[in-house]
Structures are given as C-alpha cells and as structure tokens.
C-alpha cells in the first residue's frame, strides 16, 4: 500500500540519481550525470500526470510534451543545483511528496469518520405517508459502460435495430434521446443514486452505498446489492451496500496500480480492472439475477461493455470497430441478463442504461482545445448521450413522466411504486450538464434537451427522442 508507493519511487530515484551516476562518473561529469538522473527521475515519476490530459499536449504531441518537460526539468534543476545543492534536493523531494500529501488531506476532509452523514432529506422524505413504497418490486439497475442511443449509433454506422426490437418484444420502454448530466462514469452514476445537482462529497462516497436512494429503499425493507468488476468505484468512505463485490476499495490497490501507471506513462481508464478476474464478476452477476429472495432487493451493477475510447487524445484507426465489437458483447450480455430475469424474477423492474457516451468523434477525448463553434450535436451526444430502457411490471400503473436523463431513473421508479405521483417532479435533477462541460465539449451545454452554444445552438440534442421539449 502506502509503504510500497513511497519506497519504490525512492529506490528508483536513488538508483538513477546516485548509483548509476557513480558507475558512469568515469566517463563524464559527476555533477551533470547527477542532475540528468534527477531530471529523468522527476519526469518519469510525473509521467502519468504529464500525459493524463491529452488536450494539454504541446502541439498535440505527447512526445514533444515529454521532451520539453525533460529539458525544462534539467534546466531548472541545474540552475538550482548551481545555486545551492541542499535547496535543490529539498525542492525535488517536496514537490514529489506534495501531490501525495494534498491528495491525503483532501481525502481525509471528504471522509472524516467523526462526521455524521446528514439525513435530514431522508427523514423529511420518510415522514410523508404517501412516499411509502407500496409496490415492493425487485429492482435491477444494469449499467452498460458507454452504451449509446440509437441515433448516435446510426451516426457511427452501427445498426442496433435488432437489439431494440428484442427489448421492445420483452416489454421494455425505450427512452430515445436520453442523456446524462455528467460525462464520466463517477459523476454520472453517483447522481443516479444520490439525486443531487451539486455533490457535497467525493463521487465515490455515494457509489460506496452512502446515497439517498439506497437509504430510502433500505428504510422500506429492501436489501441493497452493489456489484462491480473492480473496486474502481469504491472510495475510502465506509461501504454501506448490504452486499457488495469486490471486497476492496480503490485505496487498497493504490500502490502497485499507481506505480504501474507511472511506468506505463499514462493512466489507462481500465487499469484498476487488471487485478480482477472478469469471470468471477460475471458468475456473481448471473447468480444475483437468477436468485430469489424473500425480501425485496435493489440490485445495481456496472459492466465493462461496450466501453469507450482509450482517451489518449488521438483516435486509433480501429477505434470505432473496437466499440462495435464491444456493442456486440454488451448486447449478448444484455440478452442473457434479461432472459435470466424474465425466467426467475418476471415481475421485477429492470433498468438498462448507459452512463455516458463512448468518445468516438473529433480527438476521441475531451474537446477543450477546440473552438466552441466546431462542436456539433454529435460531439455532444458522443460524450453525454446515454441509452435508457425500463421494463415496468404490468400491474403497475406507469405514469407518463417526461423522462429525459438517466438520473430520472429513481424519481420515475419512486413515483410509480408509491402513492405520491408528483415525486418525479420533486426529486428530478436539472436537465443540464452539471460539471466539466467546459472541458468535455468546449463549454457547450444542454438545457431541457436543447443545445446551448456550438454549431447546433438552440437545436434539440436528439432528433429521435421520446420526451417533450420544454423551455
């Protein structure tokens, strides 16, 4: 863990800056070799941070960016070393440790165990008799990573009509044109569970099971289950799901994983999956979907398919084909899930949803370096669009809510399984992008389904949509 994370970089830096320097001092200046070793160690240990955001690469080149960092590091260290050796070493060590210290302080402030989570909103909700759940159906929320809408898929060149037909034949309502108010998995899905526009805690805190929606269902006798492929979604807050997998959080695997990212040169979005066997996750997923429990269950899972781009800032030649292959895998998984649920839990509420878009247009990542006028409808769909389909049991009188974003899932469910039919309007979040839209789509936003800014300013985000546009 922490010891591993600190000791390995120290050994690495010492080896490059002193051991190799001593060995090669016979062939050149000891001082210049030491400075070169320090500069190289500094750049390598900060490589993941340097390359993390492709939009900041100089001239759009990772190679040029890394080279300039090395030259600048060497120059700064040389000047400091010429002035005062002690100051040089203190400055380098302080800079390397400052990131870890700041991260630790921020994490501690988010997760102070002495703080009692405010439950005022929960208590207010539970006091109102009409908010009591009267249709205690099992609820299954199946999140498919970056699963796009039909309109967006057609733009990419992928025909998903067969899957749509399968869903409709199995009593699913397709909410065409749905999108998320967040463009990342954590920001998007945490708000599905917490139902808050501005989150007061780290996003992982809510995915740990500390969320309003889960508390409401627990208070109504539900068992909550959170199933994930890896602990990427779990932060250091207490994990409050009644049952969950894996039994780790993201901090437990930090040392080796972060060092691996450093020496690879960048943070892969799926690097946390490397230590976890997907077959175990899939087996547990199938077991939960096929099991029957005396108590009502709220089951939540987030799978890996179809997946999104590799976020390097340059689209791979086979980027779309990789996504299409992922779509095929996701569709097979979806069919299996639905067949299992229809056989074992036919009266359950089933949600099929994407979390955000796959990032396949322009540079296949964030668009902050683009002029806003260059950002079109499909660029926005590509980052914020998210598929949504819901199977409503036939004995529920489903209200005609204007479902528009994936964060509408639980406001709609609670409005339909309680006697409070206006709960949807009371709980729904803003129909706009809530964070990072300056980075993701160069400041373009969406308000109530209409694009604000960019090439398609004042036009609907989706032409093919199930909801009514409201000003």
Tell where the protein language model's regions lie, with residue ranges.
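Active-site His/acidic residue clusters
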Residues: 235, 292-332, 359-368
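Surface-exposed cleft-lining segments at the edges of enzyme active sites
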Residues: 105-114, 265-279, 312-327
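Alpha-helical transmembrane signal-anchor/signal-peptide segments
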Residues: 110-130
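Metal-dependent active-site segment of extracytoplasmic phospho-/sulfohydrolases and closely related
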Residues: 140-141, 330-370
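Internal/C-terminal transmembrane anchor helices
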Residues: 84-111
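Loop-to-helix transition at the N-terminal end of transmembrane alpha-helices
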Residues: 1-11
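Active-site rim elements
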Residues: 201-204, 318-327, 338-339, 374-377, ...
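Active-site-proximal alpha/beta segments of enzymes that process anionic O-linked groups
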Residues: 12-39, 46-49, 53-77, 136-141, ...
């Amino acid at each position: 863990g922490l010891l591993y994370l600190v000791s390995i970089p120290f050994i690495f830096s010492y080896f490059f800056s002193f051991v190799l320097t001593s060995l090669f001092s016979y062939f050149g200046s000891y001082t210049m070799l030491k400075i070169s070793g320090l500069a190289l160690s500094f750049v390598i240990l900060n490589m993941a941070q340097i390359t993390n955001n492709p939009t900041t690469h100089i001239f759009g080149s990772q190679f040029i960016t890394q080279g300039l960092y090395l030259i600048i590091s060497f120059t700064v260290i040389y000047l400091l070393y010429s002035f005062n050796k002690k100051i040089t070493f203190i400055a380098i060590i302080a800079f390397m440790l400052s990131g870890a210290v700041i991260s630790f302080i921020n994490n501690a402030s988010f997760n102070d165990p002495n703080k009692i989570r405010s439950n005022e909103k929960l208590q207010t909700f539970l006091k109102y008799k009409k908010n009591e759940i009267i249709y205690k159906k099992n609820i299954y929320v199946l999140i498919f990573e970056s699963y796009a809408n039909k309109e967006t898929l057609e733009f990419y060149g992928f025909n998903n009509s067969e899957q749509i037909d399968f869903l409709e034949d199995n009593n699913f309502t397709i909410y065409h044109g749905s999108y998320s108010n967040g463009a990342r998995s954590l920001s998007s899905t945490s708000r599905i569970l917490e139902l808050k526009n501005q989150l007061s805690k780290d996003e992982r805190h809510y995915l740990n099971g500390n969320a309003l929606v889960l508390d409401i269902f627990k208070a109504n006798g539900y068992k909550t289950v959170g199933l994930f492929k890896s602990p990427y979604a779990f932060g250091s807050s207490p994990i409050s799901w009644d049952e969950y997998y894996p039994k780790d959080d993201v901090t437990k695997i930090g040392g080796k994983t972060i060092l691996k990212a450093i020496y690879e040169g960048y943070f892969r979005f799926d690097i946390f999956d490397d230590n976890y066997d997907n077959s175990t996750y899939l087996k547990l997923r199938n077991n939960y979907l096929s099991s029957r429990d005396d108590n009502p269950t709220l089951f939540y899972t987030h799978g890996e398919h179809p997946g999104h781009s590799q976020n390097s800032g340059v689209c791979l030649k086979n980027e779309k084909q990789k996504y299409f292959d992922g779509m095929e895998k996701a569709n097979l998984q979806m069919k299996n899930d639905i067949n299992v649920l229809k056989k074992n839990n036919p009266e359950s509420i089933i949600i099929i949803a994407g979390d955000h878009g796959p990032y396949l247009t322009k540079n296949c990542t964030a668009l902050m370096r683009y002029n806003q006028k260059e950002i079109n409808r499909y660029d926005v769909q590509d980052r914020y669009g998210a598929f949504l389909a819901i199977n409503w049991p036939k004995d529920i009188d489903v209200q005609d809510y204007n479902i528009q974003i994936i964060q509408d899932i639980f406001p709609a469910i609670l409005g339909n399984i309680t006697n409070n039919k206006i709960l949807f309007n009371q709980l729904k979040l803003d129909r706009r992008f809530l964070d990072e839209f300056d980075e993701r789509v160069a400041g373009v936003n969406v308000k109530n389904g209409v694009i604000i800014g960019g090439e398609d300013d004042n036009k609907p985000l989706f032409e093919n949509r199930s909801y009514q546009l409201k000003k």
